[in-house]
């Protein structure tokens, strides 16, 4: 009981210290327009080419088969996608049941 009380008091003290407002920082009035990047730099970063991601179909069956949970991981993967379950076929690809 005493350990619980000490832990609770410690958590409350840390919470109060972190929530206590600090002194406001004085900010000098500067020319903020000079700090803005030019419009072309902004547009170049806005229209970047999206990254192409690799989708590996055999990850659940191949990688987890060493631990003996390949079929269970495949079934959980399929249930997560809204199917009734799944299994690893002979090519180590997860096949979902409908």
Swiss-Prot record:
Compartments where located: Secreted
Propeptide: 20-58
This protein's record includes keyword Signal: yes
Record-level GO BP terms: defense response to fungus; defense response to Gram-positive bacterium; humoral immune response; innate immune response; killing of cells of another organism
A Pfam family recorded for this sequence: Defensin_2
Tissues with expression: Is synthesized by the fat body and eventually secreted into the hemolymph.
Disulfide cysteine pairs (residue numbers): 61-88, 74-94, 78-96
Gene Ontology CC annotation, any one: extracellular space
Signal sequence coordinates: 1-19
PROSITE patterns xrefs: INVERT_DEFENSINS
Stated induction or repression of this protein's expression: By bacterial and parasitic hemolymph and gut infections. Expression peaks at 24 hours post infection by bacterium P.carotovorum, and at day four post infection by the parasite L.major.
Keyword line: Antibiotic, Antimicrobial, Cleavage on pair of basic residues, Defensin, Disulfide bond, Fungicide, Immunity, Innate immunity, Secreted, Signal
The protein's role, per its UniProt record: Has antiparasitic activity against promastigote forms of L.major, and antibacterial activity against Gram-positive bacterium S.aureus. Has antifungal activity against the yeasts C.albicans and S.cerevisiae, but not C.glabrata. Has antifungal activity against filamentous fungi A.fumigatus, F.culmorum, F.oxysporum, N.crassa, T.viride and T.mentagrophytes, but not B.bassiana.
Family: Belongs to the invertebrate defensin family. Type 1 subfamily.
Protein name as it appears in the record: Defensin
């Amino acid at each position: 009981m005493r350990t619980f009380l000490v832990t609770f008091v410690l958590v409350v003290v840390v919470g109060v210290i972190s929530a206590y407002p600090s002194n406001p920082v004085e900010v000098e009035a500067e020319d903020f327009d000079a700090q803005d990047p030019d419009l072309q730099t902004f547009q170049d970063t806005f229209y970047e080419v999206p990254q192409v991601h690799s989708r590996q179909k055999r990850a659940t069956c191949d990688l987890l088969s060493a631990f003996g949970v390949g079929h269970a991981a495949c079934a959980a993967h399929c249930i997560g996608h809204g199917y009734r379950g799944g299994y690893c076929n002979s090519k180590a690809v997860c096949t979902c049941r409908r």
